[in-house]
Amino acid sequence: AFGKLQGTLTSQLSVDFELGGKTEKMPMPALINLRSHPDEATRRRGYEAENIAWEAVKETLVACMNGVKGETLTLDKKRGREDAIHASIDFARMDRKTLNAMLDAMKDSFPMFQKYFKHKAKLIGKEKLAWWDISAPMGKTDKVYSFEEARDFIVSNFNKFSPELGAFAKRAFDNNWIDAEQRDGKRGGAFCMGVAGVKESRILSNFDGSFDQVSTLAHELGHA
């Protein structure tokens, strides 16, 4: 219930935002996608508007999180589990050893990520990155992908790695497993979920034509 409340609340959030000389109600998914806008001033305004929007509903979102975590802790206690990570491990169909190996690999990679962000800051003329610069695009491009172009790009590159994976991605597109449209009332972000009854997956994304969203779509198909 608390998870559904969080999803319903965040999907209805919108802010008045000026873009291209025109002020409109912008849903949160579209606002979040401005993190990769080529103009720094637009990225910063989007970041600040996003924070203001979250601030307005922070008490409800905190209550949702406490409700979800409280339920998990109660169930773990009843089941005699040591900590709250077990529910997430079970949901992901993995064991603790695999999780620890993944976390260790991530920690080992921290210096590489730090080096990348320092170099990115240098390339855009800064000593260090502001939060609104983390997803800033590198270089300049006017390319905007249609959904069909994104599909062809993903399937083609999946095929280079594995024809089986490419065929699977094509099946997902052909059978409309993907809800990619940005619209009012839709939750932000992207995710993939399995549908056990039909042994298929369904994917949510908020596709805006950017390469970042093409990459996100490919990422979620990897989960499928």
Go through each PLM region and give its residues.
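His/Asp/Glu-rich acidic catalytic environments and adjacent acidic regulatory segments
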Residues: 1-97, 101, 105-108, 156-157, ...
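A glycine-rich phosphate-binding loop feature that marks nucleotide/adenosyl-phosphate handling sites
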Residues: 18-23, 74, 120-138, 171-182
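Structured ligand/cofactor/substrate-binding pocket environments in proteins
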Residues: 46, 53-54, 58-62, 205-206, ...
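Flexible hinge/switch segments at interdomain interfaces of large molecular machines
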Residues: 78-84, 126-131, 193-197
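Catalytic zinc-binding patch centered on the HExxH motif and its immediate surroundings
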Residues: 143-145, 178-200
